[in-house]
Amino acid sequence: MRNDHVTLRSTAVFDLLAPQTPAVPVQVELRYDTRDPYAVVAAFRTGRAGWVEWVFARDLLADGLIAHAGVGDVTIRPAVDDPEVVVIELSSPSGHAVFEASAQELADFLDRTYDVVVPGNENLWVNVDDALTRLLPHDLS
């Protein structure tokens, strides 16, 4: 396990798509934290003080840059008509949203994460003892 924790942040603007209305720009903060080396966080600005966070696999983001990836709550794929755009769909019991994002911005963010944790070396950053402590009940009596 590595102890030299790193958090990467990148801001972007995704376009929220809705039928028969113009796209709405949404501020997004992308985060990568070596304490959870398999995941990325996309935090979407929902208003003056609100953010909604989605956590998904770093591999899902990488795979979605080149082909349709994901099943269920998060799917990512290149746009059919524009190779410079990636479509991100998010689904939850409270709603469904479709965003378009710059493929280059997402690729640049991923490259920065790979500079910190090389794909395939994520396990070197996982603190198994800490993870078990959080999962197991503290009172085992």
Swiss-Prot record:
Q: Where in the cell is it found?
A: Cell septum
Highest taxon of the lineage: Bacteria
Could you tell me which cysteines form disulfide bridges?
none
- Keywords, alphabetical: Cell cycle, Cell division, Coiled coil, Septation, Sporulation
The UniProt record lists the keyword Coiled coil = yes
Gene3D superfamilies hit by this protein: Sporulation-specific cell division protein SsgB
Q: Quote the InterPro entries the UniProt record gives.
A: SsgB, SsgB_sf
What cellular component terms from Gene Ontology apply here? cell septum
Pfam families registered for this protein in UniProt:
SsgA (PF04686)
The GO annotation for biological process reads: division septum assembly; sporulation resulting in formation of a cellular spore
Q: Which family does it belong to?
A: Belongs to the SsgA family.
Quaternary structure (record): Interacts with SsgA. Interacts with FtsZ (via N-terminus).
Quote the function comment for this protein.
Involved in sporulation-specific cell division. Required for early stages of sporulation. Important in the process of growth cessation prior to sporulation-specific cell division. Recruits cell division protein FtsZ to the future septum sites and tethers the contractile ring structure (Z ring) to the cytoplasmic membrane during sporulation. Stimulates polymerization and filament length of FtsZ in vitro.
Q: Know the name of this protein?
A: Sporulation-specific cell division protein SsgB
Q: Which organism is it from?
A: Saccharopolyspora erythraea (strain ATCC 11635 / DSM 40517 / JCM 4748 / NBRC 13426 / NCIMB 8594 / NRRL 2338)
- Taxonomically, what lineage is the organism? Bacteria, Bacillati, Actinomycetota, Actinomycetes, Pseudonocardiales
